[in-house]
Curated annotation (Swiss-Prot):
Record's function text: Specifically methylates the uridine in position 2552 of 23S rRNA at the 2'-O position of the ribose in the fully assembled 50S ribosomal subunit.
Record localization: Cytoplasm
Active site (record annotation): K179 (proton acceptor)
Catalysed transformations (reactions): uridine(2552) in 23S rRNA + S-adenosyl-L-methionine = 2'-O-methyluridine(2552) in 23S rRNA + S-adenosyl-L-homocysteine + H(+)
Positions in coiled-coil regions: none
Naturally occurring in which organism (per UniProt): Bradyrhizobium sp. (strain BTAi1 / ATCC BAA-1182)
Catalytic activity, EC: 2.1.1.166
Family per record: Belongs to the class I-like SAM-binding methyltransferase superfamily. RNA methyltransferase RlmE family.
MF GO annotations: rRNA (uridine-2'-O-)-methyltransferase activity
Alphabetic keyword roster: Cytoplasm, Methyltransferase, rRNA processing, S-adenosyl-L-methionine, Transferase
UniProt binding sites for S-adenosyl-L-methionine: G76, W78, D99, D115, D139
Enzyme class, UniProt record, top EC level: transferase
UniProt name for this protein: Ribosomal RNA large subunit methyltransferase E
Gene Ontology CC: cytoplasm
Gene name of the encoded protein: rlmE
């Protein structure tokens, strides 16, 4: 264990047995990530929770009484924040969450384990909603192949799928938030969002690792068909 340039203790993991270097580096990063440590102290399920907190604190997506859809919800950090901020824990708002993986119960959240790629997934989600949503948010990530262009197209395709669903279920004035990655492959997606929302912007929360190309596309003021402003 050594100190880094900020004076914090830095944990180093030895490579032993069958542990791969990539696994060692991932584990080291987790152990030395201040957001991971903070999430444990605050009782949040993942460091990603702070990304939504920062975005919502700035743009005020989540309000009491709202209905929210959380796509790719596991392990539940975003659902936790959404449930608290819309009042779902007290039965005032509603949070519908899905993921391909299992997710432990979150107070105020209705969760179903399903593959969003499945043909019947949108229909099942609409039935769970029982009406329109105020916010559709997605922290889904596509499986990577290691081939940069292929991975970019997969990620954009996943966001396009989420955006299409949002266009089917959002109330007028609703918002769409989705994880994406910086690339030149999302021009068509942005053009569609500009037609459907009043404002479209990219945001990179402080909790997003600075060495990552991860960012979020935030579309607000759902209206469909009218030109929007890209910020």
């Amino acid at each position: 264990m050594a100190k880094d340039t900020t004076g914090r203790m830095h944990v180093q993991v030895k490579t032993g047995g069958k542990r791969k270097l990539s696994s060692k580096l991932w584990l080291e990063r987790q152990l030395n990530d201040p957001y991971v440590a903070q999430a444990k102290r605050d009782g949040y399920r993942s460091r990603a929770t702070y990304k939504l907190i920062e975005i919502d604190d700035k743009y005020h997506l989540l309000k009491p009484g709202m209905t929210v859809v959380d796509l790719g919800a596991a392990p539940g950090g975003w659902s936790q924040i959404a449930a608290r901020r819309v009042g779902a824990e007290a039965g005032k708002g509603k949070v519908i969450a899905i993921d391909l993986l299992e997710m432990g119960e979150v107070p105020g959240v209705t969760f179903t384990q399903m593959d969003f790629h499945a043909q019947d997934a949108p229909e099942k989600l609409r039935a769970m909603l029982g009406g329109r949503a105020d916010v559709v948010m997605s922290d889904m990530a596509a499986n990577t192949t290691g081939h940069r262009k292929t991975d970019q197209l997969r990620i954009v395709g996943l966001v396009e799928l989420a955006a299409h669903f949002a266009g089917e279920v959002l109330k007028p004035g609703g918002s769409f938030l989705a994880k994406t990655f910086q690339s030149g492959a999302d021009a068509e997606l942005l053009a569609q969002l500009k037609r459907d929302y009043a404002t479209v912007r990219h945001v990179k929360p402080a909790a997003s690792r600075q060495d990552s190309s991860e960012r979020y596309v935030l579309a607000m003021g759902f209206r469909g068909g009218e030109p929007a402003e890209l910020l």
